[in-house]
Amino acid sequence: MYRTMMSGKLHRATVTEANLNYVGSITIDEDLIDAVGMLPNEKVQIVNNNNGARLETYIIPGKRGSGVICLNGAAARLVQEGDKVIIISYKMMSDQEAASHEPKVAVLNDQNKIEQMLGNEPARTIL
């Protein structure tokens, strides 16, 4: 049996831009992509903390160190600049792999710089 497990998460990223006229996707600072083991063109889920919207799209790498988090195309209708979002990637794995799997979670500050790296999510609330 295979399970779909969270593999990486950018927690509380700040949307820096919403570009309705670009062809779909989310542009993410390449340093952030690397930090949580995501890949260009990988499918991700995005959860908007401000309005509850959830959507799926794919990653386009943005300039390293820029802090860019830009929702493109139709996704731009579901966010506004300054919104806090959670960006999640998932992997399929066997029960055996899942038993020892530790996702990479980056908690970001308001400038989309990594404040803290976590493995398994803590049992406490992170604000």
Curated annotation (Swiss-Prot):
Required cofactor names: pyruvate
Modified residues (Pyruvic acid (Ser)): S25
Annotated active site: S25, Y58
Cofactor remark: Binds 1 pyruvoyl group covalently per subunit.
Locations listed in the record: Cytoplasm
Enzyme Commission number: 4.1.1.11
Any one GO BP annotation for this protein: alanine biosynthetic process
InterPro entries the UniProt entry points to: Asp_de-COase-like_dom_sf, Asp_decarbox
Pathway stated in the Swiss-Prot or TrEMBL entry: Cofactor biosynthesis; (R)-pantothenate biosynthesis; beta-alanine from L-aspartate: step 1/1
UniProt keyword terms in alphabetical order: Autocatalytic cleavage, Cytoplasm, Decarboxylase, Lyase, Pantothenate biosynthesis, Pyruvate, Schiff base, Zymogen
Molecular function (Gene Ontology), one example: aspartate 1-decarboxylase activity
Function: Catalyzes the pyruvoyl-dependent decarboxylation of aspartate to produce beta-alanine.
Name used for this protein in its record: Aspartate 1-decarboxylase
The organism of origin for this protein: Bacillus subtilis (strain 168)
Designated gene of the protein: panD
